[in-house]
Amino acid sequence: MIHNRDQMSLSSKERLIFYKVSIMDNLSERIKSELLEKADPKYREFHSGLVPGTENIMGVRIPELRKIARSAAKEDWRNYLEKCCPDTYEEVMIRGMIIGYAKMDDEERMQYLNRFVPEIDNWAVCDSCMSTYKFMQKKPEIWYSYLRQKVEEGTEFSIRFGVVGLMDYFINEEYIDRLLKIFDKIQHEGYYVKMAVA
């Protein structure tokens, strides 16, 4: 830790970098601390059975993760998303939720989602984070195209991400025929794709 006297000898650019790193460390540490405080071993055991093969589950319930993510989305969330290397299932979930809760334009949100979607390795992160992406309803044509592209990427969880988003926000008279055509064309043997389209 740099003490105040040491900070005085830093240039303004160095002080800004130090300040941003301190904030990120504080936010990251606060999130880790809250997760430890809210972790429930019984829930961890139960939830581990729902997401087989997923490691590093702490056992924090989804409503608590949403509270943490909403709070983080009011702080220096950009720095957090850029620098954070999630160690736990819950930290990955929080990153995805922050993308939904933070205020940003569509282009920036797409950039963060493009980095986040490849990190998804289970249905729960995919579906829980998608439910925070209500912004997709505000500009449906942009987000319909984006989700269609995710389906076309062809990986198990990019397809699921696209399908779940289309089902959450685009099942209406305007889009239903298009969705059915997209779903009919999906040829993927992944279990979580099949369950999303079923």
Stretch-by-stretch model annotation:
Residues 1-6, 196:
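Short intrinsically disordered, low-complexity coil segments enriched in acidic
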Residues 3, 10, 23-26:
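N-terminal leader/targeting segments
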Residues 6-18:
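Intrinsically disordered, low-complexity segments enriched in serine/proline and basic residues
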Residues 23-198:
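Alpha-helical scaffold domains
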